[in-house]
Amino acid sequence: MHKNWNYSNKPLANLESLFKMLETNEERLTYLLKNKKNYFKTVPVIRKGKKRTTYKVVGELLKIHELIKQRIFSKISLPEYITGGRKGVSYIDDCKSHLNKSIIIQEDMKDFFPSIKQDLIAKAFQYYMNFSPEVSSLIANLSTLEGSLVQGTKLSTDIANLIFLEEEALISEEVGKLGGNYTRYVDDITISFESEVNNEDISKIKTMILSMALKSGVRLNRKKSRVLRNGQSKIVHGVKVIKEIRPTQKRKHNIRMCLFNLKKK
C-alpha cells in the first residue's frame, strides 16, 4: 500500500509541548475538561424534514479547537479522494469525479460522528502523527462530548478523515486497479467505473468498505446502499451526474427553502 497522507509537523512527545502549542496550561485544560458540557451548545437543524442535533463550541474551548485545527490538522496533507472538510473542495468536486460513468456504487455511514469514539481517536493521533499516548488522549478528550464526536464542531470532520486514512488507502488502491474512482464526502462514499465491473469485484469492494466501517465502530446504512448501472438515474449528493452536472428538482427545492428561511431571519 502506498502511503498517501503526511503530517509535516514534529510529533508532540509530551504534554508540555501540547500546552505550548495551545497557548494554555494544565490548570486551564483541567478546568475546561471538568466543565466541558458548558462549552458545547446544541444547534437544532432540520434536514430532509427530520430534526437533527448539531453542536457549536463556544468560549475558551472554541479557541482551543481553533488552535488544534490551525496547528495540527492544517499540517496534514490528505489524498484527493477525501473531499469533505478540505479547504476549497466541495460536494460538487466530489460529483465531478463520477460524471458520465457506467457504474456508480454508493454507501452511507449511519450516525456517523457519534459512532466515532474517544478511544479510537486517541489511537489515531498516536498511529498517524506519532503523538505520545498522553497527548493523544488529551486531544481526543478535548475534541469529544460524552466520549464521542459530535456533528458541527470545527474538528469533527478533520478527525473523522484521520480515522479512515489507512483503510481508505487500501480501498482506493483496489478500486484503482479495476479502473475506478473512489471518493468520500464526510459520511458518503461513492465509487464509479467507466466500464462494466463483475459482481465478484463489486462484492469485494463493498466488503472492504464494510470492514473499514466496522473497525471504526461505524455502521453502514443499508437503505442507502446502491449499485447504479447504465439506464438508471445516477444521482450523487442530490446532483445528476449523467453527461453534465445538474441539481435534481428536490435539491433545487431545498436550496430555495434555505434561501427563504435566511430571508425570514
Question: Which positions does each model-derived feature cover?
Answer:
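Non-catalytic, polymerase-adjacent accessory regions of viral genome-replication enzymes
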Residues: 1-38
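N-terminal low-complexity, intrinsically disordered segments
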Residues: 12, 18-26, 67-82, 110, ...
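Conserved polymerase palm-domain catalytic core
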Residues: 32, 97-186, 190-229, 263-265
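Short, conserved non-catalytic motifs in the polymerase core
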Residues: 41-65, 83-87, 141-160
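Short acidic (Asp/Glu) and glycine-rich catalytic loops that position anionic groups and cofactors
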Residues: 45-48, 232-239
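Active-site-proximal segment of RNA-dependent polymerases
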Residues: 61-106, 111
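Active-site and adjacent loop segments of nucleotide-processing enzymes
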Residues: 235-265
